[in-house]
Amino acid sequence: MPLVRYRKVAILGYRSVGKTSLAHQFVEGEFLKGYDPTVENTYSKTVTLGKDEFHLHLVDTAGQDKYSILPYSFIIGVHGYVLVYNVTSLRSFQIVKNLYQKLQEGHGKTRLPVLLVGNKADLSADREVQAVEGKKLAESWGATFMESSARDNQLIQDIFIRVIQEIARVENSYGQDRRCCLM
């Protein structure tokens, strides 16, 4: 019988970057054509990875901006984060940097299980943020970077599989740098 693990993942980013579309495409397998601003929504899906099952509880958040205050519900009990920007919006890329800093301050950790996602890759003709910029930012955080398209269902499954792996990587890394002796 597989081990079932519960993982809560918050999806954060500027407004209209496709956070809801990513979550909906992952869980329901379809693209939402209309835009309805999200206040907060949740999605659930069970994923099998190796011999383990992961029950993912996705928190789809309202769009944040530079001055948004992250509620503790986005920090306490959250195992990992998908930070999303729109490849056609430099502003959304700048906001994601600010969100990461707020998460670090809220957690008080240097290592966070984060996946940086450049969404709307299908609109590359209007691109304002190059993939190399996203990759460089993710590397500076020690995170993984991916570009996706919720409309084209490009790498959607991979995003959420990867965030599960990031959570495990960060959880397993704590304690490796510490040296102590109990007496």
From Swiss-Prot:
Residues binding GTP: 16-21, 32-38, 63, 119-122, 149-150
Domain of life: Eukaryota
Localization of this protein: Endomembrane system; Cytoplasm
Family per similarity comment: Belongs to the small GTPase superfamily. Rheb family.
InterPro entries: P-loop_NTPase (IPR027417), Small_GTP-bd (IPR005225), Small_GTPase (IPR001806), Small_GTPase_Ras-type (IPR020849)
Gene3D superfamilies in the record: P-loop containing nucleotide triphosphate hydrolases
Chain location of the short sequence motif Effector region per the record: 35-43
Enzyme class at the top of the EC tree: hydrolase
Primary gene name: Rhebl1
Record propeptide residues: 181-183
Keyword DNA damage: no
Keyword list, A-Z: Cytoplasm, GTP-binding, Hydrolase, Lipoprotein, Magnesium, Membrane, Metal-binding, Methylation, Nucleotide-binding, Prenylation
Residue numbers binding Mg(2+): 38
Keyword Transmembrane helix carried by entry: no
Oligomer status and interactors: Interacts with MTOR.
One Gene Ontology term of the molecular function aspect: GTP binding
GO biological process: small GTPase-mediated signal transduction; TOR signaling
Source organism (scientific name): Rattus norvegicus (Rat)
S-farnesyl cysteine lipid sites: 180
Disulfide bonds: none
Protein name according to UniProt: GTPase RhebL1
PROSITE patterns in the record: RAS
PANTHER family, sorted: RAS, DI-RAS, AND RHEB FAMILY MEMBERS OF SMALL GTPASE SUPERFAMILY
The reaction(s) this protein catalyses: GTP + H2O = GDP + phosphate + H(+)
Protein purpose: Binds GTP and exhibits intrinsic GTPase activity. May activate NF-kappa-B-mediated gene transcription. Promotes signal transduction through MTOR, activates RPS6KB1, and is a downstream target of the small GTPase-activating proteins TSC1 and TSC2.
